[in-house]
Amino acid sequence: MSACPPAGHLAAATTKRPAAPLVRDEEARVVAPVRLDFMAEPTYTVKALDESTWAAFATLVERNNGIFGGCWCMGFHDDDSRTDPVHNRAAKERRVRDGRAHAALVYEGDDCVGWCQFGAPDEVPRIKNRAAYDKGRTTSPDWRIACCYVGKGHRRQGVATAALAGALDLIAGLGGGTVEGYPEGADAVPAGFLFNGALSTYEKLGFIRDRKIGKHRWVVTRVVEPGS
């Protein structure tokens, strides 16, 4: 089993101020996702994780010790993620270059400051509280929100909300469908351990509680319409 938390690593669980709006960058597949009903600084740009944005993603991961000592956001994939950060980095890069890893990257200026990982269930099959999840499952989602991460120095500034909103817009561009997330209540779990995100962040963006699968963990769902 992986030495990484099999459930990703969301940092910015709550925000002290509203999330910033997102702007479009046509050349880099940047999205202007779910419109938020407020304006605040800073303004973030969201780009899809792919070969063109890999370097910025890798810089953020390296700046934050490989994420949990070298996970490289591999914990949700079905690969044999290990304690060796070199192995995990190479495995993640292969997935990105092969189009088998999806994420919305949040930029402030030229710097990537956070992300939200998502994918179809066969791309991100690992989730926490699996036994309880399977016991209550009646259907499978089209997409899962695996995890989000916000770099040090950028937390509690709306990055997590921008990342999740960006992921939803990318999902719309990929055909939309039913999206599941597995957040916990920010009032019950320290921000550094909210690997799947804060329940309030999801609900802010239209997710509905489906069922509880852990002491503080919920399955939440939302239908995303196909993008034009």
Labelled PLM ranges:
Residues 4, 31-75:
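Conserved N-terminal entry element of GNAT/NAT acetyltransferase domains
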Residues 111-151, 155, 189-199, 203:
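Conserved acyl-donor/pantetheine-binding loop and adjacent beta-alpha core of acyl/acetyltransferases
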Residues 5-6, 18:
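Compositionally biased, intrinsically disordered low-complexity segments enriched in Pro/Arg/Gln/His
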Residues 66-91:
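Conserved GNAT-fold acetyl-CoA-binding loop/helix
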Residues 4, 192-205, 210-228:
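C-terminal "cap" of GNAT-fold acetyltransferases
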Residues 171-191:
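Conserved GNAT acetyl-CoA-binding A-motif
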Residues 87-105, 121-126, 144:
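A short helix-loop-beta-strand connector motif used in the catalytic cores of GNAT acetyltransferases and
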Residues 147-150, 156-172:
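Conserved acetyl-CoA-binding loop-helix of GNAT-fold acetyltransferases
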